[in-house]
Swiss-Prot record:
Gene: rplR
This protein's UniProt keywords: Ribonucleoprotein, Ribosomal protein, RNA-binding, rRNA-binding
GO cellular component, one term: cytosolic large ribosomal subunit
Complexes and interactors: Part of the 50S ribosomal subunit; part of the 5S rRNA/L5/L18/L25 subcomplex. Contacts the 5S and 23S rRNAs.
Organism: Desulfosudis oleivorans (strain DSM 6200 / JCM 39069 / Hxd3)
Protein name (Swiss-Prot/TrEMBL): Large ribosomal subunit protein uL18
The keyword Ribosomal protein is annotated on this UniProt entry: yes
Family that this chain belongs to: Belongs to the universal ribosomal protein uL18 family.
General function of this protein: This is one of the proteins that bind and probably mediate the attachment of the 5S RNA into the large ribosomal subunit, where it forms part of the central protuberance.
Molecular function via GO: 5S rRNA binding; structural constituent of ribosome
């Protein structure tokens, strides 16, 4: 087993531990974060029905074609993604969420998304 597989295996164990404790509801959906080497993804999920309300990522055209973000680092783009998902959540009438870091350390881009979402008006 390579080091990368071991690292991912440990992250998935952390993710499972976290998911045992938290769940999204229609009133307070789960803000789930996934971080890849290049992009960051966020979605609001109702776990009772298994429905995704809102998504935002650094891989979508709204973010990729934004001239303000050209030349920015990944953490600054993550803050924008957080603000984007907060704005989309407000449009759907969602103001309070449960934060799910997805097994990732609450640092760097994961923290940047949460900071952006809080700046955008989400409560968690």
């Amino acid at each position: 087993m390579g080091a990368a597989n071991k690292k991912q295996e440990l992250r998935l164990k952390r993710k499972a531990r976290i998911r045992k404790k938290i769940a999204g509801t229609p009133e307070r959906p789960r803000l789930s974060i996934f971080r890849s080497a290049r992009h960051i993804y966020a979605q609001l999920i109702d776990d009772t029905k298994g429905v995704t309300f809102v998504t935002a990522s650094s891989n979508e055209p709204d973010v990729k074609n934004n001239t303000e973000l050209s030349g920015k680092n990944k953490s600054e783009v993550a803050v924008f993604v957080g603000k984007l998902i907060a704005g989309r959540a407000k449009d759907k009438g969602i103001s309070s969420v449960v934060f799910d870091r997805g097994g990732f350390v609450y640092h760097g881009r994961v923290k940047a998304v949460s900071d952006g979402a809080r700046e955008g008006g989400l409560n968690f």
